[in-house]
A protein has these predicted regions:
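Hydrophobic, well-structured mid-protein blocks that either form specific transmembrane helices
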Residues: 59-111
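Hydrophobic alpha-helical transmembrane segments
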Residues: 1-63, 97-204
């Protein structure tokens, strides 16, 4: 839901940046890979070591490149099928790494198995949300929307992790359990959207 409004509000700032990067010979695929590698390294290195605030700051910077690579693609005229698949694949890798890093932190640093369950629920449900949309589109039906998409997922997760890194009690607990619940609702919403789309196509 927030993806549409967030991208629209920042497009006027990143579009000129996209033009300059194209002029410098930097393509969207390069930015996508850099953003993914940076996110994965920060999530699987800083979070497991207990550096929640530092990890959150670094991850936020690299996640923002997801907006920039789209601007670069538009500045070049259009995206490519390869770029679309690469971007979607890298998004899934980055999302998985963030929740894997937080799961490790919950187990090893915080010694909180219950919170680790919440992190794992977030990891699995995030992948399922994306898979439903991809599989639906491959089948010629729609599965857009839902309460939580990628933008909301990162805002909730990084806010909770960052505040916990600053010493705010239970911030990550609230964030992960809330996100897990919202993502389960989103899975249901997308499945219902697929069903409605199929019905609409079947009705003469």
């Amino acid at each position: 839901m927030l993806n549409i409004f967030a991208r629209a509000s920042v497009s006027r700032f990143v579009e000129p940046m996209g033009v300059r990067l194209v002029q410098a010979g930097i393509g969207p695929d390069t930015i996508t890979i850099i953003g993914t590698v940076g996110t994965v390294v920060a999530a699987l290195w800083l979070y497991p070591l207990g550096y929640l605030l530092a990890g959150t700051i670094v991850i936020t910077v690299f996640v923002l490149l997801d907006v920039v690579d789209g601007a670069v693609a538009r500045a070049r005229g259009s995206g490519t099928p390869w770029g679309t698949v690469l971007d979607a694949t890298c998004d899934r890798i980055a999302d998985g790494a963030v929740f894997a890093g937080l799961t490790w932190w919950c187990f090893v640093v915080a010694h909180d198995r219950l919170l680790a369950v919440a992190a794992l629920l977030c990891l699995v449900s995030a992948q399922v949300i994306s898979y439903i949309k991809a599989r639906a589109e491959a089948s010629g039906v729609r599965a857009d929307g839902g309460m939580v998409e990628r933008a909301e997922r990162y805002i909730i997760t990084l806010l909770g992790a960052g505040l916990t890194g600053l010493g705010v009690p239970f911030a990550l607990d609230v964030a992960l359990w809330m996100l897990a619940g919202l993502q389960i609702v989103t899975v249901i919403q997308r499945m219902l959207a697929v069903r409605r789309s199929v019905w609409d196509r079947e009705v003469p």
